[in-house]
UniProtKB/Swiss-Prot annotation:
One of its GO terms (molecular function) is iron ion binding. Its cofactor is heme. It comes from the Eukaryota. It comes from Penicillium crustosum (Blue mold fungus). This is Cytochrome P450 monooxygenase claJ. Pathway: Secondary metabolite biosynthesis.
């Protein structure tokens, strides 16, 4: 251990210094590979997220890039708005019945419906479930938490996969919900393969692109599509939903009443007709909404786990320390987002810090690393931003909420379960819907 450098494993360094983040997670002009030991924990060897080689990853990412570009996300706004409208209907019903809504599950259902529609052309219809299929969300959380364990004890994954299914179901009934996820992904992926090779990508789904004639045959197998489907469903659901539920919780805390009022005032002035659907590009222009979202992304963190990278063809220099080529190096988003030298009083929810920084010409946005950075940055960053902007714009104009048996401890990062998780016993952000404004 030397200052901010920690040899976190015998083969990996962790550097706690936000100014060095862009060096570890460099852009496409500099080669960065993933650590092979890390990607094995995904147990999805054919998915893009498991590709260690920089060049191969670049080719594979190129197949999907256009589906997540700003232009493509703008075109899919009707899909996002459709999911938000269905969620709004459920909130309206809750207002009438007095039902308590688990917003973690509700937002996860919304984002899952969006990504399944975008990826396969048909929605998973999670919003139609009575409890938003919360058991599915819990199963996903459990699956991702197990990756942290498998990272340190990789042999356990092989042992678990060898256990007969009936025994697994007795040991953990949640396995049944995981199998439902696998069944959905497998069915949709196999249907895509059975439709045959797609000649053109335009107007098609993500998985049509992966089954395109330009893709080598050995990469168009059902296994490739199934692995990619698992990762897209997980990545396209949890982090965005967590950011939204975290945002709602902070806005509804009594000490943040002025923040809530300021946000509602800005939204009502910008979009006075609640029956209209503002566009993402319009919502992005609102300074206070943007500040609120930046602060929520900072405090929800995205992935909480380490994401090691290697620079196979160059050595790195951090201050006086030389880091040999091919050494796995990582930095967690939590330490960047909670750095008091960048964000004073980092535990405090304070959107005004972004307003002040903007007026002073400071670019704090460079320190939002919820989606990582560089050539391996989250592919769905544009879709995530669109979902967050559009969902908050709609529900905060049309509904009044009250927290129900929920505190800041239900959103504050307490432990690493691959995604950041709250303290033991937390069941998420729960609300009562007090008023509907349309």
């Amino acid at each position: 251990m030397k200052g901010p450098i920690v040899r976190i494993t015998p083969n990996e360094l962790h550097i706690k210094d936000a100014s060095f983040y862009d060096e570890i997670y460099a852009g496409s002009g500099r080669i960065r590979n993933k650590d092979e030991r890390f990607v094995k924990t995904f147990s999805a060897p054919h998915a893009m997220v498991s590709i260690t080689d920089h060049a191969y990853h670049r080719v594979r990412r190129g197949l999907l890039g256009e589906f997540f570009s700003q232009r493509s996300v703008i075109k899919m706004e009707p899909i996002i708005n459709g999911a938000i409208e269905k969620l709004s209907q459920r909130l309206h019903e809750a207002c009438q019945t007095g039902a308590v809504i688990n917003m973690d599950a509700a937002f996860a259902a919304m984002t899952a419906d969006v990504i399944t529609r975008h990826a396969w052309g048909q929605s998973g219809n999670y919003l139609d479930h009575g409890n938003f299929n919360k058991q599915w969300k819990d199963a996903v959380a459990g699956t991702m938490a197990s990756r942290v364990l498998f990272r340190h004890f990789p042999y356990m994954l092989h042992i678990l996969m060898a256990v007969p299914l009936p025994i697994l179901l007795k040991l953990d009934p949640g396995v049944a919900d995981i199998l439902k996820i696998e069944g959905l992904v497998r069915r949709l992926s196999v249907e895509n393969v059975n439709r045959g090779i797609v000649e053109k990508q335009e107007g098609k789904t993500i998985f049509d692109a992966l089954n395109n004639v330009s893709v080598p045959p050995e990469q168009r197998t059902a296994k490739h599509l199934i692995d990619e489907g698992h990762i897209l469903l997980l990545a396209g659901t949890e982090t965005t939903a967590k950011a939204l539920s975290t945002c709602l919780c902070y806005l509804l805390l009594a000490e943040n009443k002025n923040v809530l009022l300021a946000l509602q005032s800005e939204l009502r002035q910008a979009f006075p007709n609640v029956s209209t659907w503002p566009k993402w590009t319009e919502a992005q222009k609102l300074p206070y909404l943007t500040a609120v979202i930046n602060e929520c992304l900072r405090l929800s963190h995205g992935l909480s786990t380490r994401l090691p990278r290697t620079a196979p063809k160059e050595s790195l220099q951090y201050k006086q320390w030389h880091i040999p080529a091919a050494t796995p190096v990582s930095q967690t988003a939590y330490f960047v987002h909670m750095d008091p030298s960048i964000f004073p009083d980092p535990e405090r929810f304070e959107p005004e810090r972004w307003i002040r920084a903007s007026k002073e010409g400071l670019h704090l946005e460079r320190y939002i690393v919820s989606f990582s950075k560089g050539s391996r940055q989250c592919l769905g960053i544009n879709m995530a931003y669109a979902e967050i902007f559009l969902a908050l714009t709609h529900i905060m104009r049309n509904f009044e909420f009250q927290l129900h048996d929920t505190s800041v401890d239900d959103v504050r990062l307490f432990r690493d379960r691959f995604f950041g998780a709250a303290q033991d016993g937390s069941v998420g952000v729960r609300v009562l819907v007090n008023e509907v404004k349309y």
